[in-house]
UniProtKB/Swiss-Prot annotation:
It comes from the Bacteria. This is Bifunctional protein GlmU. The gene is glmU. The keyword Lyase does not apply. Its EC number is 2.7.7.23, 2.3.1.157. Pathway: Nucleotide-sugar biosynthesis; UDP-N-acetyl-alpha-D-glucosamine biosynthesis; N-acetyl-alpha-D-glucosamine 1-phosphate from alpha-D-glucosamine 6-phosphate (route II): step 2/2; Nucleotide-sugar biosynthesis; UDP-N-acetyl-alpha-D-glucosamine biosynthesis; UDP-N-acetyl-alpha-D-glucosamine from N-acetyl-alpha-D-glucosamine 1-phosphate: step 1/1; Bacterial outer membrane biogenesis; LPS lipid A biosynthesis.
Length: 459
């Protein structure tokens, strides 16, 4: 196999997005558009990848890191001009170069591989990825000669009446013989309505020089959708969401209502897990097998063990063990580690806490900056008082501890193994192992007080 290279065009300003965020960094199913493209082209066995950047270059470089080299298009003068900015990296290389736009997040490695194979089998100097659509307005048209070969590509704004009737369109993805590509770029003119240097003109240049120009017509037009505004962004989101949901269902995940379930592109979900409506799985979340998630649950960048149930709750940047029960209406905040067979009940908030195996906080509790041992019971209304207005402090609760209802543990404080804390206590000192700590005022009953009070009011 000959050397393979790729150029991703990501220098457009994206003015139609009307956004401060660089266009190709707008997310689709939780991942920036350009990252989707990079992830797919990286499966093609490339020797070099060059991303052409312009406005917002630093943000794109930060997103992609060292998986790509970068070339700067300081002034946007057209797609041919953009590709030419990669000459310093690629111009002298032997091989095949794929050119693709960074705002086409739906393109797949399979389609690009088919394009490359067509290019090789045809012995072509250039091959165009095309599609046939009923409403081609706005797209460049593929003009073929009497032999069916690609003669040229005409931009919509420059097309005559006959050319506008053509329904085979240019998707904006190509592959070229690398040296032929860079040799032809200097011959491209900007003599057109827009005054720009069009990459499709390279096709006509190569054809006029007697080279073979081939085309691969994809059946999956939706893969070629370019995102230039918020409407197209929403369309891409829907298509990608459906693709991700279908992939998970094929792999054994039950999604009760796919139209109302959102899964990020990088999430991994085990078989026989059930997702109820309103479930949102974000980021690099990993969910085990035989889980039940939702309804109306958000999980972000977290790891969920097998046979765990999460209902109407939120989990962020945390790790949950196996056979955990969460919710309804619980909130597990970042940097929490929840052990196996744990119960986190309704209106319980856990933050930056290690919560041991088989421990329970079943109702109305806040556990923050804490280390909770195994087999602990936190009664309704248990609170770790971790903040003094300036600093956060740690609470340590040992194994087998029982915390009575409506108790406050004022950190820094330790409740040692096997200790009991009486209901209604405010604990400000360490509790020894197996001790009972009572920290509340003694009850006083005043006999006949109510009658005396009422009689006093009457007099």
């Amino acid at each position: 196999m000959s050397n393979r290279f790729a150029v991703i065009l990501a220098a457009g300003k994206g003015t139609r997005m009307k956004s401060k965020l660089y266009k190709v960094l707008h997310p689709v199913c939780g991942k920036p558009m350009v990252q989707h493209v990079v992830d797919q082209v990286s499966q093609l066995g490339l020797q070099k990848l060059v991303t052409v950047v312009g406005h917002g270059a630093e943000m794109v470089q930060e997103q992609l890191g060292n998986v790509s080299e970068f070339a700067l298009q300081a002034e946007q003068l057209g797609t041919a001009h953009a590709v030419d900015q990669a000459a310093g990296v690629l111009a002298n290389e032997e091989g095949t170069t794929l050119v693709i736009c960074g705002d086409t997040p739906l393109i797949t490695a399979e389609t690009m591989e088919a394009l490359l194979q067509q290019h090789k089998e045809a012995g072509a100097m250039a091959t165009v990825l095309t599609a046939y659509i009923e409403e081609p307005a706005g797209y460049g048209r593929i003009v073929r000669n009497e032999n069916g070969h690609v003669e040229k590509i005409v931009e919509h704004k420059d097309a005559n009446e006959k050319e506008l009737a053509i329904k085979e369109i240019n998707t904006g993805t190509y592959c070229f013989d690398n040296k032929a590509l860079f040799a032809s770029l200097s011959k491209v003119s900007n003599d057109n309505v827009q005054g720009e240097y069009y990459l499709p003109d390279v096709i006509e240049i190569l054809k006029n020089e007697g080279h073979i120009v081939s085309a691969y017509q994809t059946e999956h037009f939706d893969e070629t959708l370019g995102v230039n505004d918020r409407v197209a962004l929403s369309q891409a989101e829907i298509i990608m969401k459906n693709r991700i949901n279908r992939k998970n269902m094929v792999n054994g995940v039950t999604i009760i209502d796919p139209s109302n379930t959102y899964i990020s592109a990088d999430a991994i979900i085990g078989s026989d897990t059930v997702l109820h409506p309103g479930t949102i799985i974000e980021g690099n979340t990993v969910i085990g097998s035989d889980c039940e998630i939702g309804p109306h649950t958000v999980i972000r960048d977290s790891e969920i063990g097998d046979r765990t149930i999460i209902r109407q709750s939120t989990v962020h940047d945390s790790k949950l063990g196996t056979e955990v029960s969460v919710g309804p209406f619980a909130h597990i905040r970042p940097d929490s580690v929840i052990g196996d067979e744990v119960r986190v009940g309704n209106f319980v908030e856990i933050k930056k806490t290690v919560f041991g195996n088989r421990s329970k906080a079943s109702h109305l509790s806040y556990i923050g900056d804490a280390q909770v041992g195994e087999d602990v019971n936190l009664g309704c209304g248990s609170i770790t008082v971790n903040y003094d207005g300036k600093n956060k402090f740690k609470t340590v609760i040992g194994n087998g501890v029982f915390i009575g209802c409506n108790s406050n543990l004022v950190a820094p404080v330790t409740v040692e193994d096997g200790a009991y804390v009486a209901a209604g206590s405010t604990i400000t000192e360490n509790v020894p192992s197996k001790a009972l700590s009572v920290a509340r005022a003694r009850q006083v009953n005043k006999e006949d007080y109510v009658d005396q009070l009422l009689n006093k009011k009457k007099s």
